[in-house]
Amino acid sequence: MDTSSINAQSIFDDNAATLKLSWLTGHEGWERGFSADTVGNATSSADLVGHLNLIHPNRIQVLGEAEIDYYQRQTDEDRSRHMAELIALEPPFLVVAGGAAAPPELVLRCTRSSTPLFTTPMSAAAVIDSLRLYMSRILAPRATLHGVFIDILGMGVLLTGDSGLGKSELGLELISRGHGLVADDAVDFVRLGPDFVEGRCPPLLQNLLEVRGLGLLDIKTIFGETAVRRKMKLKLIVQLVRRPDGEFQRLPLESQTVDVLGLPISKVTIQVAAGRNLAVLVEAAVRNTILQLRGIDTLRDFMDRQRLAMQDPDSQFPGKLV
């Protein structure tokens, strides 16, 4: 992953208001950031931000009241040694939290080494939690996929397929039926957790839907605030096909999935043909997926009925064909 854009300046700009940060000294080191090896070897954002630690280099070091109190109780020789070790680690920046006064020697060494030094009245724990969440977001795996991302019945659904199949028209029909648009054409996905992928719309395309013959439609203006969504978790991919290929199955025995950022996402394939109500079919696919997530599999239930009927032809059970 390219980490060149992640530096002290960008992190300060994004978090200054939330964390009430003040840039005390070391402005010349605004380009300081994380090395590619540091990010690659980190198992989580917790490895990149934490309390004062002289063992792990190239991480954001936060000094709270406890660390400052410990520093004040040291001898002059130990203070100088600890400060030298801290600066030698070349952290992206240091944060003195809890409203504590930055030790003069720390300020002096940060100034000489161009190490950014921030201060904040917020507690060290709050600063660390906030920065870890921030780092997990900006360093999370990302991908941009083509399609229309819709909120259908509270489930994030990505409509995909070849150009000209009517994905945008289908999206418009679903929006008119009360569902919400997240993004059209290009959808930015990011894996923020071990079990979910979140999709958003690029700022340039916010609230817009392109329909052939009509051009760009501002969905928020036409249908109202409730017709758009800022983000949704991706739960289902609906692939539109012009005609079934050799691998198309009317009753697939195994659920289809698509790998998105390392996470398997459920997929259904719907054939586009004259006279088919695609909006109703997509809604039905979503409702069926919701049932499957709750442990209800209609096809499996039918196969169980069929097996019982074959084992005991005289048995009477709901749904038996006569």
Curated annotation (Swiss-Prot):
It catalyses: [HPr protein]-L-serine + ATP = [HPr protein]-O-phospho-L-serine + ADP + H(+); [HPr protein]-O-phospho-L-serine + phosphate + H(+) = [HPr protein]-L-serine + diphosphate. InterPro entries: HPr(Ser)_kin/Pase, Hpr_kin/Pase_C, Hpr_kin/Pase_Hpr_N, P-loop_NTPase, Ser_kin/Pase_Hpr-like_N_sf. It comes from the Bacteria. The keyword Coiled coil does not apply. One of its GO terms (biological process) is regulation of carbohydrate metabolic process. Pfam families: Hpr_kinase_C, Hpr_kinase_N. The keyword Transcription does not apply. GO terms for molecular function: ATP binding; magnesium ion binding; phosphorelay sensor kinase activity; protein serine/threonine kinase activity; protein serine/threonine/tyrosine kinase activity. Keywords: ATP-binding, Kinase, Magnesium, Metal-binding, Multifunctional enzyme, Nucleotide-binding, Serine/threonine-protein kinase, Transferase. Its cofactor is Mg(2+). Both phosphorylation and phosphorolysis are carried out by the same active site and suggest a common mechanism for both reactions. The Walker A ATP-binding motif also binds Pi and PPi. HAMAP family: HPr_kinase (MF_01249). NCBIfam families: hpr-ser. This is HPr kinase/phosphorylase. It comes from Burkholderia lata (strain ATCC 17760 / DSM 23089 / LMG 22485 / NCIMB 9086 / R18194 / 383).
